Every structure is written in C-alpha cells, then in structure tokens.
Amino acid sequence: TERKALEERLEHRAFHDYLTDLPNRQLFVDRLRKALDRTRRKKGRKVAVLFTDLDEFKIINDSLGHEAGDVLLKLVAQRLRRCLRPEDSLARFGGDEFVVLIEDIEGPEVAVRVAERFSEELKRPFLLEGRELFAPSSIGIGLGDARTKTPEALLMDADTAMYRAKEVGGTLRVFDPDMYK
C-alpha cells in the first residue's frame, strides 16, 4: 500500500545518508554493536573499523563550491564501495568522513589491505566538470574483539589512528593504545 511504501521510505531516510545513500552513523553503530556481539561467540575473531577522512576536501568545497563537493562525495562513495566485499559495511558519518566495518577477521592484515586499496583508489583523479580532482585520504584502523567495551570506544580508536595518519601526511595507521599518551 501507499502508506507502507511511505513508512519504508521514511525508515530508509532515517538510517541512510541523504547524499550518498550509504548507511549513516546510527545504522553503522548498530551494525558494529551486533558485529562485536558476534565476536563474543567466535573466539579469536575480530572486527575492524576503518575511519577515512579526505585530506583536502575543504579546499575543494571552498574553491569549487558545495555542489562540486557533493558530487565528489558521491563519486568517492562509489569508489570505496567497489573496494569492499559484499559483507563489509560502508557508511558516511557526514562531511568527508567515511567508515567501514570489516567482520570476522583474525588480525589487521585484511583491514590494512582494504585501507591500501582505498588509498590507491582515492589517489586516482576524479573527473568533475572537465577538471581532474584528487581526494587523498588519511585512514585509521581500529580492531575490536570480545573485550571491546562499546562500538563508540572502537570508533574512537579508529578516529585517533586516523588523526595520527593525518599528522604524518595522508597515510594509514593501525591503532595502538600508545596513541592516547
């Protein structure tokens, strides 16, 4: 019915980014919480969160305008999606922040490979209105397992690692507890 379709559209909008149609923060945190619960049932398995920030997005937005920035964000989302396995979850947290959940891994290697693919994809130029634009990124990786207290704690670890990557110039970093010192 029409009412049911409207309810479904409203629910979709509540949990997805309006621009990229990716899951939003609320849906991502829910998926991360469930993934962490699954690590408690699978001994030795981990989840990874990749926190990706576009290093020069503000410059693009300021010089070419918000419409061009929005188009670039859609293109970035498409490229990042192609780097993932079907079971991985990509979300946009707003602005130029993209976050990925990778489940059922043993260690950081798979997450590092995905982050390297992201980095390579974002180094390739984007063609926008006849211009070549670049969207270099900084990526932080946080690993969670049965001992991880909350999804928010794991997101904070990945975010901290991303800022460390940004400090050294557009690279990727795996979270280390020493980063909080």
What is each residue range found by the language model?
Residues 1-9, 180:
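Sensory coupling linkers of modular signal transduction proteins
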Residues 8-48, 55-85, 91-100, 106-116, ...:
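Conserved long alpha-helical elements within nucleotide-processing catalytic cores of c-di-GMP signaling
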Residues 26, 109, 133, 149-152:
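Conserved catalytic/ATP-binding subdomain
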Residues 100, 135-137:
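HATPase_c (GHKL) ATP-binding subdomain of two-component histidine kinases
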Residues 101-102, 143:
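A structural signal for hydrophobic residues in beta-strands of small regulatory alpha/beta folds
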